[in-house]
A protein has these predicted regions:
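N-terminal small/polar-rich segments of proteins
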Residues: 22-89, 106-148
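Short, Gly/Pro- and small/polar-rich lid/capping loops
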Residues: 15
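Short, surface-exposed beta-strand/strand-loop-strand elements in extracellular ectodomains
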Residues: 88-101
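Positively charged n-region of N-terminal signal peptides that target proteins for export
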Residues: 1-4
Length: 148
């Protein structure tokens, strides 16, 4: 009986010391972040030769070929030219021209997403060709690209 009493006492003590352990709820938050610098690639027309007597010659296109821009920002391209081809042997002899997008003179454009482009044409009036002196003529066209 002593064994039985010892066993009962041990069982009672074990039951008395049993307790369910509860862990306190603990939530933590972490931040995941990255930064992407704005990047873009703009393609501009290459050197172009205008055939004698050609009123309209393709000048290629300005194209935003790749872009990761900030929201609300754009890539702006401005074109600057004298509008006059000068004779290499006598710079006082000139041939007027315009660079056009469609039927309008082109000066600038803004691009917001990759793939946007503006086709350009070099336009020389027939009358200007008729008045031009023989020789080689050149001018430089400057493209300014900015991010705003």
């Amino acid at each position: 009986m002593k064994k039985y009493l010892s066993f009962a006492l041990a069982a009672a003590l074990s039951a008395a010391f049993c307790a369910t352990a509860f862990a306190a709820k603990d939530n933590r938050q972490v931040e995941v972040k990255t930064h992407i610098d704005p990047t873009y690639t703009v393609t501009i027309p290459a050197n172009t030769t205008v055939g004698f007597g050609d009123v309209d010659t393709s000048f290629g296109a300005i194209k935003l070929t790749a872009a990761q821009l900030d929201p609300g920002k754009s890539v702006n391209v401005t074109l600057k030219s004298s509008g006059t081809l000068k004779n290499k042997n006598d710079t006082s002899k000139m041939l007027a021209y315009t660079i056009r997008s469609g039927e309008s003179a082109f000066t600038s454009a803004s691009y917001k997403k990759a793939g946007e482009s503006t086709a350009l044409t070099i336009h020389i009036e027939k009358d200007d060709w008729a008045k031009a002196y023989a020789g080689d003529y050149t001018d430089t066209v400057e493209f300014t690209i900015s991010y705003k």
